[in-house]
Every structure is written in structure tokens, then in C-alpha cells.
């Protein structure tokens, strides 16, 4: 049932509750701007939680290693003082500029806002994994065919076939081979060629494990499957030699990456290049003043799709929004190490130096 109460009036609506969207809450909070956050998933964390909650992340500054789940939990703890309101399980479907300069925003569940600014932190847009194109195979999805790993324990002691040549395929193959509670009975990696778009160290480790007969790597493409009694029993793999072989399995994991789908964002009248939102690099504004884009959803010369790059973009976007939200206020750069004002906002005591 749609909710047609008066719109929620706010300074900022953030679209996306992944790591970058969460950090946007923090940067706005330091400027005393409260935000409402909308995400299509039922929980925060975005791609980190949906695709690799237990995979290690090594490139967050001052954090040698953390999982996607830990990063999300730490960000939620970091933004807690700012009291953001979250609206999960709904997608922003309508964005309309009003005569007073604000934006009318409505979600798929009928939640409505009047906001001075919008921050799009929607990652690659809707989560649409690239699927394995084999007729009939889709009937096994979520029973024996998976495009993501939510709980590694579900695959312990299974005969796994993993298809893909990127970081996700290699990382999960290595994870399921190593000793531990999630160790698989066997792991076979399949990729269409003997070359990978993955970390060289991971590729080297995979080859080392293959030489030690702890896993297998097959060059070829999945062209069919075998089933018995409604169970997937094997896949047909055609090699470069043209020979098709049957590879037995219990579970098939496919990691072909995500197919970017902007969804309703594509209808908001913003400049788009290669399914991403064009922004300036001064304040990460889109072609519509008052709408900003941060993280993987944006594109600009030199863009790197890294979490730490998204964090940097959040800071400049927050400062860029201040003249729109509070044009009468002068904004001075302050530091969380020394500013009593920021300490008050964060709910911490100011240090006393002798």
C-alpha cells in the first residue's frame, strides 16, 4: 500500500547505503546536515554485503585488512552520532525539480521527500549479476547454481565448480581450497582462457595449488549440463581443442561480474556516459545542480573505482552542497583532531593538552 502523507522535508537524500553512501552520511554530518538514506536492499552495506561479506579488503587506509561485513559495521558505528534515517527495501523511482529549487523524491514504497540536495551513491545501480547463458540451467539457480556467496559454510564439503576469471572467482576458489570449516571436498576452476583479470598473487597461488593437485583449472567454456532426478550432476565444458567433457559437481558458482543497470536513475535527465553519471571533480555535481554522484556510479577523467576514492568524493560533495543547503553560512575547514565544534557533533570529549 502506498503512503501518501505529506513529504518528509530534509536537507539531503542519499540514494544507496553501501560504504560510500554510509560515508556520505558522515561527511554531511560533520557539516551538521542530517540525511535520509534509501536503498533497494533490505540492509546496509551494498555490494560489500551482497557480494563479498566475508572476503578480505586490504586497501582501506589505516585498516590492514577487514571484510565487507566488518567495514559496513564500522561505518555504521562511525555515523551513529548523526542520526541518519534509513529506508530499506525501496528504490527511488521519481525525482522532480520543484519551483523553489528543492527536489520531490518518491520511492517504490511511496515514501516521499522534499529535499534540498540528492547524493547518488548507488554503486553500479541495480544488482544484476551477469549470468551463464546455457538454456535450461536457470532452473537450478539458488539451489545448485549461485552467482554470489552469502554464507561460505553452505558450500563446505561440496564438490565445487567455479566459473570466471576475475578476482571474485579466484578469491573464492582459493578460499574454498584452504583448510578450515568452509573447505570444499574439491574445487575446479573454469575460465575461457588461460589469462585472468585478477590479482597476480591470486593467480600464482591458484597455479601452485593446481601443481600440488589440491585443485584443478580447466580452460574452456560451459556449453551444456547434465541432470538426473531434477538435480544438476555436471556441466559440459568445451575446450579450445573442440572436445566437450563433462565435469561432475555438487554446486556451480559463477562469477562474471555485474551488469550495470541504472534503473530509474537513467530517467532523471542527468548526463550519462557508459551507464555512469558524469560529474565535475570540484564538488562531484552532476549536470543538475543540487544532485551529486559519488562512488562507482560516477565517471570523470582519471576515475578509479575504489572505495577510498569514493570516500574522498564524499567529502568534496558535502562541501559542495553547503551553499545550496545553507547559503547564509560560511563554511570553514575544521579538523576532527582539534575542533571543539566537531567533537560536540561527534559526541566526544575535547582532549586537554598540558
From Swiss-Prot:
Pfam families: Pyr_redox_2 (PF07992). InterPro entries: FAD/NAD-bd_sf, FAD/NAD-binding_dom, Fd--NADP_Rdtase_type_2, Ferredoxin-NADP_redctase_2. Keywords: FAD, Flavoprotein, NADP, Oxidoreductase. The keyword Transmembrane does not apply. FAD binds at residues 39, 47, 52, 92, 127, 296, 337. Homodimer. Belongs to the ferredoxin--NADP reductase type 2 family. This is Ferredoxin--NADP reductase.
Amino acid at each position: 500500500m502506498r503512503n501518501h502523507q505529506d513529504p518528509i522535508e530534509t536537507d539531503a537524500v542519499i540514494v544507496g547505503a553501501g560504504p560510500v553512501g554510509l560515508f556520505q552520511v558522515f561527511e554531511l554530518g560533520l557539516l551538521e546536515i542530517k540525511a535520509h538514506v534509501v536503498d533497494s536492499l533490505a540492509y546496509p552495506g551494498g555490494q560489500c554485503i551482497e557480494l563479498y561479506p566475508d572476503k578480505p579488503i586490504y586497501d582501506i587506509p589505516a585498516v590492514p585488512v577487514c571484510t565487507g561485513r566488518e567495514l559496513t559495521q564500522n561505518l555504521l558505528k562511525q555515523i551513529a552520532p548523526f542520526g541518519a534515517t534509513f529506508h530499506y527495501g525501496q528504490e527511488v523511482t521519481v525525482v522532480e525539480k520543484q519551483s523553489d529549487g528543492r527536489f520531490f523524491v518518491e520511492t517504490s514504497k511511496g515514501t516521499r521527500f522534499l529535499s534540498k540536495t540528492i547524493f547518488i551513491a548507488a554503486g553500479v545501480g541495480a544488482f544484476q549479476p551477469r549470468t551463464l547463458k546455457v538454456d535450461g540451467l536457470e532452473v537450478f539457480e539458488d539451489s545448485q547454481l549461485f552467482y554470489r556467496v552469502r554464507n561460505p559454510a553452505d558450500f563446505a564439503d561440496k564438490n565445487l565448480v567455479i566459473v570466471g576469471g576475475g578476482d571474485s572467482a579466484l578469491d573464492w576458489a582459493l578460499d574454498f581450497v584452504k583448510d578450515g570449516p568452509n573447505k570444499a571436498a574439491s574445487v575446479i576452476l573454469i575460465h575461457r582462457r588461460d589469462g585472468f583479470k585478477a590479482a597476480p598473487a591470486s593467480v600464482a597461488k591458484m597455479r601452485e595449488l593446481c601443481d600440488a593437485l589440491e585443485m584443478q583449472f580447466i580452460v574452456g567454456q560451459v556449453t551444456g549440463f547434465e541432470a538426473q532426478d531434477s538435480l544438476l550432476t555436471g556441466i559440459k565444458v568445451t575446450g579450445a581443442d573442440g572436445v566437450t567433457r563433462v565435469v561432475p559437481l555438487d554446486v556451480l558458482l559463477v562469477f562474471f561480474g555485474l551488469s550495470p543497470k541504472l534503473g530509474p536513475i537513467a530517467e532523471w535527465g542527468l548526463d550519462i556516459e557508459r551507464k555512469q553519471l558524469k560529474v565535475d571533480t570540484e564538488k562531484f555535481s552532476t549536470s543538475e545542480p543540487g544532485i551529486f554522484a559519488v562512488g562507482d556510479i560516477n565517471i570523470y577523467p582519471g576515475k578509479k573505482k575504489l572505495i577510498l576514492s569514493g570516500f574522498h568524493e564524499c567529502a568534496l560533495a558535502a562541501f559542495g552542497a553547503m551553499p545550496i543547503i545553507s547559503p547564509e553560512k560560511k563554511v570553514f575547514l575544521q579538523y576532527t583532531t582539534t575542533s571543539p565544534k566537531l567533537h560536540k557533533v561527534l559526541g566526544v570529549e575535547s582532549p586537554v593538552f598540558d
